[in-house]
C-alpha cells in the first residue's frame, strides 16, 4: 500500500480525525516484527479554542509538540499510567492533534498479545492506553514523525460518512458537548465508549 504523505496531515484537526479512520498505522519493531493496526476511532483536539485541549491556554513546554509540523507524534503520559498517541494536525504553529483512540489489529498480533497480556483480539487495541501498550509506544516516541522506517501510515480507502459515527470525547470535563470523537460504525474494535 502507498505511504500517506506529509501534506495529508496539514489540514483542520476535525477533518483529519475523520480522514484517519481506515488508515493503517505501522510500527516496525525490528527486521522481523512489523505491527499494523487499522485506525477505527479518533478524537480531535483543536487547539486554543478547545477547552479540553492541552493547547487551550497557549504554548508550554509540555504541549509544544501540538504546535509542531503536521504528521508528528505527540505522546504523553495520562493519569500516571497510560501513554496516549496523538498525530499532530494543522499547519506548523497552529496547535491541533488527533488522539488515536482504537485500532483493529492486522499484523504482529503475537507481539501485541505479549505486550498486552491478553489473547482476545477485540480488546487488544480497543482503547488509547491499550494500543500504546500493544505497540510498545512510550514517552521516547514523542516527537517522532510518520515519515520514516519505524513509524508510518499506509493509505486506504476513505470511510464514507454513512459508515462513520460521532460522539462526545471520553475522559474530559470541559467541552463535552462537542461531538469530536469519530469512529467506524459497527466495528467491534471501537472502544466501549462508542455508544455515548
From Swiss-Prot:
Q: Which domain of life is it from?
A: Bacteria
- One short Pfam family name for this protein? Pur_DNA_glyco
One GO biological process this protein is involved in is: base-excision repair
Has UniProt tagged this entry with the keyword Manganese? no
Q: Has keyword Membrane?
A: no
* EC number per UniProt: 3.2.2.-
Q: Which Gene3D superfamilies match?
A: Methylpurine-DNA glycosylase (MPG)
One Gene Ontology MF term: DNA binding
Which keywords appear in this protein's UniProt record, sorted alphabetically?
A: DNA damage, DNA repair, Hydrolase
Instruction: List, alphabetically, the NCBIfam families matched.
Output: 3mg, PRK00802.1-3
Family statement drawn from the similarity comment of this UniProt entry: Belongs to the DNA glycosylase MPG family.
Write down what this protein is called: Putative 3-methyladenine DNA glycosylase
- Organism of origin: Chlorobium phaeobacteroides (strain DSM 266 / SMG 266 / 2430)
Amino acid at each position: 500500500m502507498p505511504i500517506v504523505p506529509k501534506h495529508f496531515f496539514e489540514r483542520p484537526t476535525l477533518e483529519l480525525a475523520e480522514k484517519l479512520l481506515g488508515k493503517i498505522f505501522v510500527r516496525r519493531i525490528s527486521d522481523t516484527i512489523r505491527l499494523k493496526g487499522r485506525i477505527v476511532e479518533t478524537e480531535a483536539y483543536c487547539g486554543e479554542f478547545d477547552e479540553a485541549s492541552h493547547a487551550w491556554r497557549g504554548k508550554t513546554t509540555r504541549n509544544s509538540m501540538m504546535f509542531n509540523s503536521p504528521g508528528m507524534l505527540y505522546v504523553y503520559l495520562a493519569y500516571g499510567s497510560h501513554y496516549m498517541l496523538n498525530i499532530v494536525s494543522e499547519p506548523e504553529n497552529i496547535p491541533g492533534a488527533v488522539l488515536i483512540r482504537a485500532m483493529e489489529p492486522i499484523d504482529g498480533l503475537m507481539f501485541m498479545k505479549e505486550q498486552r497480556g491478553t489473547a482476545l483480539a477485540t480488546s487488544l487495541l480497543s482503547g488509547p492506553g491499550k494500543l500504546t501498550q500493544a505497540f510498545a509506544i512510550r514517552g521516547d516516541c514523542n516527537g517522532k514523525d510518520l515519515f520514516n522506517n519505524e513509524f508510518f501510515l499506509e493509505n486506504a480507502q476513505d470511510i464514507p460518512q454513512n459508515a462513520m459515527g460521532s460522539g462526545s470525547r471520553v475522559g474530559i470535563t470541559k467541552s463535552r458537548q462537542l461531538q469530536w470523537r469519530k469512529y467506524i460504525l459497527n466495528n467491534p474494535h471501537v472502544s466501549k465508549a462508542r455508544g455515548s
